[in-house]
Amino acid sequence: MVKTPITDAIAAADTQGRFLSNTELQAVNGRYQRAAASLEAARALTANAQRLIDGAAQAVYQKFPYTTQTSGPNYAADARGKSKCARDIGHYLRIITYSLVAGGTGPLDEYLIAGLNEINDAFELSPSWYIEALKYIKANHGLSGQAANEANTYIDYVINALS
């Protein structure tokens, strides 16, 4: 089961054989109050995913032109390489939407961040490429208000993990 603040609170109370405390109930209530904004953000990111992925890939190519000038399986010098880059950016974005729906970093921790350094090292992928892609997505997702805050929280979480 994916960990979220709600499942963490329940697990802690259950381990101790007690009911949820007022503090834990307030935290759960806060999550429910933010849930609508999180779902709005997840819907918008999903609806605009292809535009965001394409734009993020272009931002990477502009900032790091060698990614399109270097031959090899880990670069975007050809259509196959560009496809892999877009796929990887899409994976990051998809897991961010999962975290928005779950209401916690559990999906990011379990499906993205765990093993990230090993994957990047094994395939010679630069974290700076994905940081640039995520910065593009953050600046261009078109969200505002609480929905933007919710999305940006998870985008920043991944950027920090990559830094």
Swiss-Prot record:
Question: Where this protein primarily resides, as one coarse class?
Answer: membrane
Cite a GO CC annotation. phycobilisome
Task: State the membrane topology.
Answer: Peripheral membrane protein
According to its UniProt record, how is this protein modified after translation? Contains one covalently linked phycocyanobilin chromophore.
Record carries keyword Secreted: no
Regions annotated as coiled coil? none
| Keywords of the record | Antenna complex, Bile pigment, Chromophore, Electron transport, Membrane, Photosynthesis, Phycobilisome, Thylakoid, Transport
Report residues binding (2R,3E)-phycocyanobilin: 85
Q: Where in the cell is it found?
A: Cellular thylakoid membrane
GO BP annotations listed: photosynthesis
UniProt xrefs under SUPFAM superfamilies? Globin-like
Q: How does it assemble?
A: Heterodimer of an alpha and a beta subunit. Heterodimers further assemble into trimers and the trimers into hexamers.
Q: What is this protein for, i.e. what is its function?
A: Light-harvesting photosynthetic bile pigment-protein from the phycobiliprotein complex (phycobilisome, PBS). Phycocyanin is the major phycobiliprotein in the PBS rod.
Q: Which family does it belong to?
A: Belongs to the phycobiliprotein family.
Q: What is this protein called?
A: C-phycocyanin alpha subunit
